Each structure stands twice: as structure tokens, then as C-alpha cells.
Amino acid sequence: FLNDKPNRFNYKYTDPSLTGGDTKYSPAIKAGQFGFYAQDKWNATSNFNVTYGLRIDLPAVFNKPTANETFNQYAKSKNLDAQVGIVPSTKLMVSPRLGFNWYLTDDHKTLLRGGTGIFTGRVPFVWLSNAFNSNGVEMKSTTISKSVPGMNNYQQVLNNVVNASATSQKPDIAVVSKKFKYPQVFRSNLALEHTLPGDVKMTLEAIYSKTMNNVFFENLAINQVAKTYAVPGKENSAAPYYNSEKSDYYSIINLKNTNRGYSYALSALFEKTFNFGLDLAASYTFGHSKSVNDGTSSVAYSNWKYNYSRDTNGKGELGYSKFDIPHRVMVRVGWTSPKY
């Protein structure tokens, strides 16, 4: 890097012959998410009530990336089950929820509450946009390594790529599986609230989440071979070895699903409000979160390449999530002036 001689770099460019001469062309994904929610509450007694609801989400993509027939024929010949030019079909995402509040005493000093249900967040359409930006048609990208002749003359190398004369350069492709489902989780919680002597409010709570559908990225341009690497003396350290597929593509990142992953958290919260405006609160949370891929990047190739795993192309090895926070302590101090 300091000598201006990188090992490799990634180059993305527009093919003006397919964009009407527009060298700043950028494909746009047109998408939207429609949501509907209905909820009702049943007061069984003065101390017990149940809340139930149903949320329906309808994510939709209104256009498609330009089909790449050359790639599609290649994928078909290799039985890759991948195709440029498709997006997930529009499907209803049904998320039922159920919750309850149960006061264990008539003075309402002790409350047991909980709930369970399926949850869908805002759909991350940015992951789907890779199929538009890396379709190998209007927008092209390639990874250039030091093995390319004339690597030190960057401008010449780039000119060769754009002019399609550097036949050794392999484009990067991003596709979406025909069976891809938008992320959803199943989540349950149970909490006990109790007023201690001195009007100190205590809350003990447990939350558990299980992945139903999450993202998983695989590279179809590499093949696993009969080799493994392992750290001597370290159990479960064996990792498979992959070779690049002999093809015209540097990477083929396929977006699909995994149902592996979970998280849990146990917390204790203590709160005290004084009559002169002072509010105090302190809490401790213990928990763990495990996932296959957190999808922290907007770029498909980065989500695959930088995912820590012994077998990043495997069926889904669980590891600690990048959002895993095993211990968290929070203290809050607030004061409300009588003047206001």
C-alpha cells in the first residue's frame, strides 16, 4: 500500500454502450413495504387482561434487474440454481402476537407480564439492490489481482477492462435465490414487576428470540475440495479448503436464507422516584446473541468475505453475533424542577 503496489483492488464501472453513453448510470431498485395491524384487548378481570394482535406486511419490489443471459446460461450448465434478472416474489408476511398482564395482588404492587409472537422489521431492500448493481450488464465490476500483466500501470489496466480487451478479468455477480424470504424472528418475554419497601420498583425480565428467516450469503464461484486445515491440538478447528471455479466469474454471491440463530437476555432493573423531582434507576443485563451472518454491510461480497466462520460457504455455522453484548450496566439520574 505504501509503495502504491496493492495485492489487488476492486473496480466498478458503467458500460456506456448499454446506457446510451451515460457513464454515471446507476440502476435504481423501486421497492416499498405496506403494513397493516389490528389489535384488541380483553379485560378478563380487574387484575388480568390479554392483548392480541395481527400484523401483516407486504414488501414488494416493483422492477427487476436487467437479465444477464450469458451468466444465466452458464449457471444453468453448472446447476447453480442462480439467475440474474429476478427478485423475490411478493408474499404476505403474517405476524401474530399475544401478550398478558396479571396483577398478582389486589393492591397492584406485583405484576406478571409477558408476550410472544412473530416480528418483522423494516425490510432491508439494500441487500436486494446488489442484484441490480452487480448484474454484469450495465454495471460491471471486477477484482484485479497483482497477477495481471501491467498491474503497476493502473490506468492502462482499467482501460483494458473497460475496452473488454483484458479477457483475463472476471466480473463479480450478485444474485438472489428464488426461494429467498425476508427476515423474521420469533420472540417471547416474561417479566415480574414488584414494588419493594421504600417505593423502589423492581423489574426482572427475560427475553428470548429465535431466528425464523435471516440472510445467508454464499459464493458459487468457488468449490470445496478434499482438503482441510486445522490448528494442531485445537479441537473443532478443522476448516474446509476451497478452490476457485474455472469460470469467467471472479465471484457469484447468492443471497439466500438461514433459520439458525438466537439471542437471550436476562435483566434486573431498580427504579426510585422521589417527591422532590429526583429519579434514579440502575440495571444489569446478561445475555448472548448468536447468528450465522449479521449482514452488516450493504455490499453482498463484503457480507460473504468478512463473515467470520470456519466455513463461510457452509450451511450455517453459528457464532457470536457482532451485536453480542454479554454484560451491560446502566445507571440513570434525572431531576425534574418543580418550576416546570
Report residues per predicted region.
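Signature of Gram-negative outer-membrane beta-barrel scaffolds
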Residues: 1-107, 295-302, 307
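Extracellular loop and loop/strand-boundary signature of outer-membrane beta-barrel proteins
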Residues: 21-26, 39, 80-87, 175-178, ...
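Transmembrane beta-barrel architecture of outer-membrane proteins
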Residues: 28-36, 56-62, 90-96, 116-120, ...
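Residues on the lipid-exposed face of transmembrane beta-strands in outer-membrane beta-barrel proteins
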Residues: 36-42, 54, 98-102, 190-194, ...
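Short beta-strand segments enriched in hydrophobic/aromatic residues
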Residues: 44, 56, 102-104, 118, ...
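Repeated loop/turn-to-beta-strand initiation elements of outer-membrane beta-barrel proteins
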Residues: 48-50, 108-110, 199-202, 277-280, ...
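Solvent-exposed loop/turn elements at secondary-structure boundaries
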Residues: 66-95, 99-254
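Gram-negative outer-membrane beta-barrel transporters
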Residues: 203-340
